[in-house]
């Protein structure tokens, strides 16, 4: 797998060859997670605090996209290693507070438009859901709670 990290300014950095990776898909929990490890020369350590997104690519296909929660470098007798940990894009829904709102009628499109896509999350396949009337979003609830 090839790993790419994106900084807050949109610049992208390709990780050195990964020697270990773990992708966990939630299967019912609200958030997927990842952990990747690479040998690292320590150059550009100043970038570590600027990474916000991770993208894992396998055979030219993106297999994971997520939010970087933690970057750690460790040096020992075997060299310097870089470990990146984080969560899937749903983490943005868990971490952000929804603005309170009352909908007379809320469709799936309304909910996705107002509470999911503003965080850069795109929805691939989706089912059909009937409109909900009325629908209220409580101030202080997470965006995940709105979608759930």
Features from the language model and the residues they span:
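Assembly/oligomerization scaffold segments
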Residues: 1-102
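Charged- and aromatic-enriched interaction segments used to assemble
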Residues: 78-81, 85-148
């Amino acid at each position: 797998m090839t790993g790419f990290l994106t900084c807050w300014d949109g610049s992208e950095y390709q990780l050195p060859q990964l020697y270990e990776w773990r992708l966990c898909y939630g299967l019912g929990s609200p958030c997927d997670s990842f952990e990747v490890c690479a040998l690292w020369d320590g150059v550009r350590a100043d970038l570590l605090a600027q990474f916000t997104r991770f993208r894992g690519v396998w055979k030219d296909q993106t297999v994971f996209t997520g939010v970087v929660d933690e970057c750690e470098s460790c040096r020992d007798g075997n060299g310097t290693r870089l470990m990146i940990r984080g969560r899937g894009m749903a983490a943005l829904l868990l971490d952000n507070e929804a603005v309170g709102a009352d909908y007379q009628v809320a469709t799936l499109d309304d909910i996705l438009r107002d509470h999911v896509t503003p965080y850069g999350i795109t929805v691939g396949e989706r089912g059909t859901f009937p409109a909900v009337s009325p629908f209220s979003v409580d101030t202080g609830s997470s965006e995940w709670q709105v979608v759930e």
